[in-house]
Amino acid sequence: MKANNLIIDSISKTYKKGKIRANDNISLELYPSEITALIGHNGAGKTTLLNQIIGNAKPDSGDITYKGISLVKNSKVARELVSIMPQFHAPLEGVTLRQSIESILRIKGVSEKQVHLCTKQVLKDLDIEQWADQAGNKLSGGLQRLTSFAMAVAYPSDIILLDEPTNDVDPIRRKLTWQYMRKLAKEGHMIFVVTHNLLEVEQYTDRYI
């Protein structure tokens, strides 16, 4: 095990006073410069695992460590080191695609110059510039997914968690989305993708769990 790997060690999580088991004694290791896919049926605890990594859900037992830091015990640090694209995107009424991306970068403390440069670049790379100034709640489901993806990757953290990133996305931009993930992996980022699309897993990921 290397310190730069994300180490998930024997984590378990239950809800409803133990009646619902979200995940049970999960152990795995994620690596920089790699795209890892997590596949499984609905209700298998995939989304719960992502939320545990970023610190939104605390496991009942076990630990998650990165660079010697427990992300379970340091949820604030986890949110600084990890970016997440959630399974569902709820755009705010009247907020444009461009504004959605810019706002998350400002929250991260990115300089105003970088906010505009990074936003412009991700819009271009995903070929969604023509919708940049449309309100998010007026966009199609696929474009809302792309908005959420762009928000997670425009100024990427060390670890990037993506929950069903290509759902409802058209074939051309599905490919662009995976190409963007590969670019980030080549830059050293750790990409962890939840998906049901086995064809995409076989074509684009380095390994799957």
What positions do the PLM features span?
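Catalytic Walker B motif of ABC-type/P-loop ATPase nucleotide-binding domains
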Residues: 160-163
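Helix-to-loop junction immediately C-terminal to a conserved catalytic motif
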Residues: 54
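The feature captures the beta-strand-to-loop junction immediately N-terminal to the Walker
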Residues: 39-41
